[in-house]
């Protein structure tokens, strides 16, 4: 509503999208008929107690990765310039075991021992594996867009409060709110890597952007390096195969 008021009703088109429900994802994609200059895959959940999506996926992988994978795949032919995926420094906690197709399928379906932060890290590692594999496929197939990944550092948003609220832990919620106010950078600054990846001219495809400050927690956008496993092409290819299988969306 705020965006509508500031920009005008005529320039804002709101589409209902629930990333935990592939039926909703498909419906939203069908609703969008215009060409898309920049598709930003930003929505997510963080470190919540174990639950599954309507399609039976572990909720964080289902929402943060599979929902976006399906939505972007359904819109692929309408994207003309860039696909930007928002990851996180939490990808450093990601661990997909031996990285086989069967193991990745088990992680996506919640068949592995669950730790809220570990699952969040996996979903954010999946964002990076997806981005770098998408850029390789875009080049190989002469698709008209590039893929980019970004992370916001430690930014003051409501995301940090969701997990303690879901667990009913008031003290943890208040500590998160205090850390947000004392340590985190403003939300607008955390959005700058996304804006840069969406608009900066001549940005090399497959770039990963984040804050330039200490430990990439705060600052202005710069090109950053993900952990080495995020560039593993075999792992990325396996995740892509599992993602197509589970989502029912083929990028071919």
Residue ranges and their predicted role:
Residues 1-168, 246-251:
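Rossmann-fold NAD(P)H-dependent dehydrogenase/reductase core
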Residues 57, 224-229:
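Short glycine-enriched, charge-decorated loop/helix-capping segments at active-site entrances
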Residues 99-103, 227-252:
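Non-catalytic terminal and boundary segments that flank Rossmann-like NAD(P)-dependent oxidoreductase
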Residues 109-120, 175-184, 228-229:
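A short acidic, glycine-rich active-site loop
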Residues 123, 174-223, 233-237:
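C-terminal helical subdomain
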Residues 127-130, 190-193, 239, 243:
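Alpha-helical packing segments of well-folded alpha/beta enzyme cores
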Residues 165-177:
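Flexible internal linker/loop segments at domain or repeat junctions
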